[in-house]
């Protein structure tokens, strides 16, 4: 069964900003970051329940090779990506964005 993944506008902005930052560090690194995020999103469409639930109905998935997390919610057959944040960010500040 494949889940429908929707990405909130705020999460799209998070991803784009991180991608630009990585690209400024080294040419091509931004594309590598985007590719890793896309892999996680693909996994969410296939098996969203494998990732840890961290707050009420919110789960988080790790972006491999990069210190970023995708925060998301599963409701029925829908997955909504709420945010993409730096893994070292204070979790309490992240939680305020997930409502």
Describe each PLM feature range:
Residues 1, 69, 73-99:
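Enriched for short, Lys/Arg-rich terminal
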Residues 39, 46-78:
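Basic/aromatic recognition patch in beta-strand/loop cores that engages polyanionic ligands
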């Amino acid at each position: 069964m494949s889940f429908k993944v929707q990405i909130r506008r705020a999460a799209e902005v998070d991803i784009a900003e991180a991608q630009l930052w990585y690209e400024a560090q080294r040419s091509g690194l931004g594309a590598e970051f985007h590719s890793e995020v896309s892999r996680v999103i693909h996994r969410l469409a296939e098996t969203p329940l494998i990732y840890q639930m961290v707050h009420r109905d919110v789960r988080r998935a790790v972006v491999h090779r990069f210190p970023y997390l995708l925060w998301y919610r599963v409701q029925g057959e829908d997955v909504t990506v709420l945010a993409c944040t730096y893994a070292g960010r204070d979790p309490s500040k992240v939680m305020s964005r997930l409502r």
